[in-house]
Amino acid sequence: MEELLKRISIEHEKLFPKAEVGSQTEKLEEELTELEQAKGSYDAINELADCFIVCAGIYRFAPQVALLCISGIENTVEELGYKAVFLKCIEAKWEFNKTRKWEFKDGKYHHTGTDQYD
């Protein structure tokens, strides 16, 4: 999983060049809130994938913090028995994010339009 984190981190820097550690930390807090509100395993895996992707952004600035975060995520996914599904979900969500249009406003990136990942 660490190799996937590193690869996404490199791509993250290209997609979100103005991202900063503070904005990525705030984004992780948002994703963790969404995880708490997840309804069922499917939603939880999707939100954990979002958390992983944000951790890839954090990895750019604080690698040890990101690795600690994904360690917790990985343990949770393994306990649920969804590691293979989780890895596919990360890849699919990241590929989807790369197709979106992004806007940088108030120190954060937000996708524009109404496209949604299902």
Can you name each region flagged by the protein language model?
Residues 1-118:
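Flexible "arm" and connector segments at domain edges
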